[in-house]
């Protein structure tokens, strides 16, 4: 039984889930909004919020931490160019999830996650 186990498993192994989160975060940073399933959007939201909170203080340590999560120098640079200026005075709530309805092929609930 999974009593008292926090976090979404999304039917994937730890490594697969970590890669999924990394790819979703990179896509969100590069495109500002992405369309994905509601479960994936809800699972990646705390990860990207924490990453933006780290990026608000532009220090070498913060850059190393962000690079370890993202593994993409281009996405890390882009994050550190807009995060301190855009979210400098904002304490959390950097993303918004909007429900889009079911997907045509399999009926999965779709959502739009975007940076505010």
Swiss-Prot record:
Keywords: Ribonucleoprotein, Ribosomal protein. Pfam families: Ribosomal_L17 (PF01196). One of its GO terms (molecular function) is structural constituent of ribosome. InterPro entries: Ribosomal_bL17, Ribosomal_bL17_sf. GO terms for cellular component: cytosolic large ribosomal subunit. One of its GO terms (biological process) is translation. Gene3D superfamilies: Ribosomal protein L17 (3.90.1030.10). Part of the 50S ribosomal subunit. Contacts protein L32. Belongs to the bacterial ribosomal protein bL17 family. This is Large ribosomal subunit protein bL17. The lineage of its organism: Bacteria, Bacillati, Chloroflexota, Chloroflexia, Chloroflexales.
């Amino acid at each position: 039984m999974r009593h008292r186990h926090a976090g979404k498993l999304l039917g994937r192994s730890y490594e697969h889930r970590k890669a999924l989160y990394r790819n979703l975060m990179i896509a969100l940073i590069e495109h500002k909004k992405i369309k994905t399933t509601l479960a994936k959007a809800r699972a990646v939201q705390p990860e990207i919020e924490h990453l933006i909170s780290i990026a608000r203080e532009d220090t070498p340590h913060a850059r190393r931490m962000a690079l370890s999560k993202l593994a993409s120098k281009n996405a890390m640079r882009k994050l550190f160019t807009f995060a301190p200026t855009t979210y400098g005075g904002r304490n959390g709530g950097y993303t918004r999830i909007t429900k889009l309805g079911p997907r045509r092929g399999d009926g999965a609930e779709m959502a739009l996650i975007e940076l505010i």
